[in-house]
């Protein structure tokens, strides 16, 4: 009889636990991820102009004419710390003289004659952690090469970095962009309507 009482009590206890309503706590995690906002010289879109004056007398006796480089500076300011890269698009790609990932087209003259090409070199790169910090000199990386001065490869992204695969985070990014044209030797005998008409777009991207 004693044994039966124990069994009965055990069954009642289990049944009571099954019927009881347990308290529940729902844990919810909310929030938003806001990417940084970056501008170039305080604007979303700017034009960097390079003007070259060329005369027939500047051409060598034979071969193409290589002009001296001209420089423009860029400064990208972000409202939060980020990594910064950019890709390049040659809007005159069909007019490139010679085949190279480094050459950008300079347009056409006499309907279908190519003016030449130009290269863009990125140098004097710096990054500031914020507006009150000192600028830190860094290098340029395209994912496979890392140098203090690097010619832009149209097929790769350029980045402010401290090594090939190590991008540098910050809020203020600066660099000089050197443009150096090479003009076709055929321009010496052109009809006079030739002009340099290079046009490229640098599209910046940033990440947390």
Where are these regions (language model features)?
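Mature extracellular/passenger domains of Gram-negative fimbrial/pilin and adhesin proteins
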Residues: 2, 20-208
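Sec-dependent signal peptide recognition
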Residues: 2-8
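N-terminal signal peptide c-region/cleavage motif recognized by signal peptidases
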Residues: 15-17
